[in-house]
């Protein structure tokens, strides 16, 4: 049995900027995940369920657990003196860590994806993305350090809190998964170099918004529902409403996750920096593909911290089918 800590140290030589700091950074995220795991498991017993009464910068009502997870992860990263600053879905602006100007890395995160599902005991997750800063080491980080295209990520991953808690990450050398053993207090390696199955047969989308979708996406949904033996259609529809949970299932079973633009969200709804980029990095490392329907997610240069984007991620052939239909059936 190999622990996450042992595995990271063992694979450190594969990382082009190996200094030991990235190992410590991932350990800090691991600690934060353990704390969140502990409190999610007793969420119904303490007063951390429901809405907090506050709103984030996007105008969304923050759940109590959103704020709790954000503070715990922020504290875990700040305590190690290895991160110069963070950007979070729950913070209006970047958070500069004073006294950490010497640090080489910045972290972007969605502390608790799918938190509205907590009240009904459905899987949620944490998403993280790590970059090397671009401003000089020794100075305070600026927004420039965070507004980098996804192809500059040095590591990314997620934690899914479900029937078991799993941490999945990549440093650009494959995707690896670890299951948390609460009796030992450690994450243990359960899957190394994860890959999408050759063919996917599941599509994940909120079909309740069908009437609002672009024409190409509507055509793709119909394509998924058609009977066609050579392509093993119709596909199965599975949608949890938690990006981490839907992505994780499709990675294991084969499938595509779709969150297109709508009339009310013409640029898409998912955040490019906190959700799309890290999941796109993981998908490509697992042999999949991620697109906004027209271009590769990882090649998009962000313009703002909370920028949104349409998002299609999963098996190559499924994402390519969506892109093809979006091209063939443009909106008027």
UniProtKB/Swiss-Prot annotation:
Its main location: cytoplasm. Keywords: Carbohydrate metabolism, Cytoplasm, Hydrolase, Magnesium, Metal-binding. Binds 2 magnesium ions per subunit. Its cofactor is Mg(2+). The keyword Metal-binding applies. One of its GO terms (biological process) is fructose 6-phosphate metabolic process. GO terms for cellular component: cytosol. Pathway: Carbohydrate biosynthesis; gluconeogenesis. It catalyses: beta-D-fructose 1,6-bisphosphate + H2O = beta-D-fructose 6-phosphate + phosphate. GO terms for molecular function: fructose 1,6-bisphosphate 1-phosphatase activity; magnesium ion binding. Substrate binds at residues 113-116, 206, 239, 257-259, 269. It comes from the Bacteria. It is found in: Cytoplasm. Its EC number is 3.1.3.11. The keyword Hydrolase applies. Belongs to the FBPase class 1 family. PANTHER family: FRUCTOSE-1,6-BISPHOSPHATASE-RELATED, SEDOHEPTULOSE-1,7-BISPHOSPHATASE, CHLOROPLASTIC. HAMAP family: FBPase_class1. NCBIfam families: PRK09293.1-1, PRK09293.1-3. This is Fructose-1,6-bisphosphatase class 1. It comes from Enterobacter sp. (strain 638). The gene is fbp.
């Amino acid at each position: 049995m190999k622990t996450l800590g042992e595995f990271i140290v063992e694979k450190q030589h594969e990382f082009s900027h190996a200094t030991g700091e990235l190992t410590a950074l991932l350990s800090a995220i691991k600690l934060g995940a353990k704390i969140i795991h502990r409190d999610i498991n007793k969420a119904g017993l303490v007063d951390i369920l429901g809405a907090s009464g506050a709103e984030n910068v996007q105008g969304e009502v923050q759940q109590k657990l959103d704020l709790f997870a954000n503070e715990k992860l922020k504290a875990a990263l700040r305590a190690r003196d290895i991160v110069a600053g963070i950007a979070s879905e729950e913070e209006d602006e970047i958070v500069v860590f004073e006294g950490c100007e010497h640090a080489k890395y910045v972290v972007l995160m969605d502390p608790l994806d799918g938190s509205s599902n907590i009240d009904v005991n459905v899987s949620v997750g944490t998403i993280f993305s790590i970059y090397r800063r671009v401003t000089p080491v020794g100075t305070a980080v600026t927004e420039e350090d965070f507004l980098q295209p996804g192809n500059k990520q040095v590591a990314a991953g997620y934690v899914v809190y479900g029937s078991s808690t799993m941490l999945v990450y990549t440093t650009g050398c494959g995707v690896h998964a670890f299951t948390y053993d609460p009796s030992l207090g450690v994450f243990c390696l359960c899957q190394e170099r994860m890959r999408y199955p050759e063919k996917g047969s599941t599509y994940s989308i909120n079909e309740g918004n069908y009437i609002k979708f672009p024409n190409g996406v509507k055509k793709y949904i119909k394509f998924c529902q058609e009977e066609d033996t050579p392509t093993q259609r119709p596909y199965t529809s599975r949608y949890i409403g938690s990006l981490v949970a839907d992505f994780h299932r499709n990675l294991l079973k084969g499938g595509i996750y779709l969150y297109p633009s709508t009339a009310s969200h013409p640029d898409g709804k998912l955040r490019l920096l906190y959700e799309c980029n890290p999941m796109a990095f993981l998908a490509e490392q697992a042999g999949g593909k991620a697109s906004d329907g027209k271009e590769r997610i990882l090649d998009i240069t962000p313009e703002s911290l909370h920028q949104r984007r349409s998002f299609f991620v999963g098996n190559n052939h499924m994402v390519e089918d969506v892109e093809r239909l979006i091209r063939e059936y443009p909106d008027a």
